[in-house]
Swiss-Prot record:
Belongs to the GTP cyclohydrolase I type 2/NIF3 family. This is GTP cyclohydrolase 1 type 2 homolog. InterPro entries: DUF34/NIF3 (IPR002678), DUF34/NIF3_sf (IPR036069). Keywords: Metal-binding. Transmembrane segments: none annotated. A divalent metal cation 2 binds at residues 64, 215, 219. The lineage of its organism: Bacteria, Pseudomonadati, Pseudomonadota, Gammaproteobacteria, Enterobacterales. SUPFAM superfamilies: NIF3 (NGG1p interacting factor 3)-like (SSF102705). It comes from Buchnera aphidicola subsp. Baizongia pistaciae (strain Bp). A divalent metal cation 1 binds at residues 63, 101, 219. One of its GO terms (cellular component) is cytoplasm. The keyword Metal-binding applies. It holds the Pfam family DUF34_NIF3.
C-alpha cells in the first residue's frame, strides 16, 4: 500500500479532519512510498522503534506520536535519537491522537465501554461518555473486573461511599480534569487513566467513586482495534506490539 494512501484511509475512518488536536494527526514522518509491513503501539518510544526496525517494518502507527504543540521545537536528546532511527531506516511514522480517543467503535473510550459492558447513554464532553451498568455492583467487584480486563490493578478512591456503582462516566488517558463536570449529570463513578492530587478531594466532597486504571492501559485497546480493522479490511501485514508502561 502507498504510504499516503494509508494516511487517507485512516484519516477518513477516524474523521480526523473534524478535530482540532494538540498533535498533527496522520503521517508525521515520511518514509518509503510502498508499505508492506506495519508495527503499531501506544507510544512512539525508542523500544517500539527498535522493534519495528528489527522486524523490518515499513511503517509505525501509534496513538502518541513525536510532535506535540506544547513540546519545544528543538530536536535533541531522545527525540533526536528517535527521529534519526526512523529516518535512517526509511520508516513511515503515523499518529492518531484525539480521533482515536473518540471514534464511536474503534476509539479508546468506546473500547473501555465495550470491555466493561457499559451501555452508553450520552456524552458530557466529546471525550467523556457516560452510561449505565446492567446491574449495580460493589466497588471491589468493579476493581476486580478492571484488573481482569485490563491486566492492571486500578487505583480506587471512594472511602466515604456506601452506594454501589451504576452510572459511570469515563475518559481515557489523562482525563482526570473532566471529573469537574461529572456531578451535575448525576453520575456516581468516574474512571480515567491518570489521577492528580486534587482529584481525590473533588471525588471525596462529591461522594464519587473514582478509578484510575493507568494512562497506557486505558489507551491500549483503541490502537489494537485500529490494527485489527486494517488487518481485516485491507489484508495488511500489521501487528500490535505492547511496550508496557505502569502509568
Amino acid at each position: 500500500m502507498n504510504n499516503f494512501e494509508l494516511e487517507k484511509i485512516v484519516n477518513k475512518k477516524l474523521n480526523s479532519n473534524q478535530y482540532n488536536d494538540v498533535i498533527p494527526n496522520g503521517l508525521q514522518i515520511e518514509g518509503r512510498p510502498k508499505i508492506k509491513k506495519i508495527v503499531t503501539g501506544v507510544t512512539a518510544c525508542q523500544l517500539l522503534i527498535d522493534l519495528a526496525i528489527s522486524n523490518n517494518a515499513h511503517g509505525i502507527i501509534v496513538h502518541h506520536g513525536l510532535f506535540w504543540d506544547n513540546h519545544p521545537k528543538i530536536i535533541k536528546g531522545i527525540y533526536r535519537h528517535r527521529i534519526k532511527s526512523i529516518l535512517a531506516n526509511n520508516i513511515n511514522l503515523y499518529s492518531w491522537h484525539f480521533p482515536l480517543d473518540v471514534h464511536p467503535i474503534l476509539g479508546n473510550n468506546a473500547q473501555i465501554g465495550h470491555i466493561l459492558n457499559i451501555n452508553v447513554r450520552g456524552y458530557i464532553k466529546s471525550c467523556v461518555p457516560w452510561g449505565m451498568l446492567k446491574e449495580p455492583i460493589k466497588s471491589k467487584d468493579m476493581s476486580q473486573l478492571i484488573t481482569q480486563k485490563f491486566h492492571r490493578v486500578p487505583f480506587y478512591y471512594g472511602n466515604n461511599i456506601t452506594q454501589n456503582i451504576h452510572k459511570i462516566a469515563w475518559c481515557s488517558g489523562k482525563g482526570q480534569k473532566f471529573i469537574n463536570f461529572i456531578p451535575e449529570y448525576g453520575v456516581d463513578t468516574f474512571l480515567t487513566g491518570e489521577v492528580s492530587e486534587e482529584t481525590i478531594h473533588f471525588a471525596h466532597e462529591n461522594k464519587l467513586h473514582f478509578f484510575s486504571i493507568g494512562h497506557h492501559a486505558s489507551e491500549i485497546n483503541g490502537i489494537k482495534a485500529l490494527t485489527n480493522w486494517l488487518k481485516i479490511k485491507f489484508s495488511l501485514d500489521i501487528n500490535f506490539i505492547n511496550i508496557d508502561n505502569p502509568i
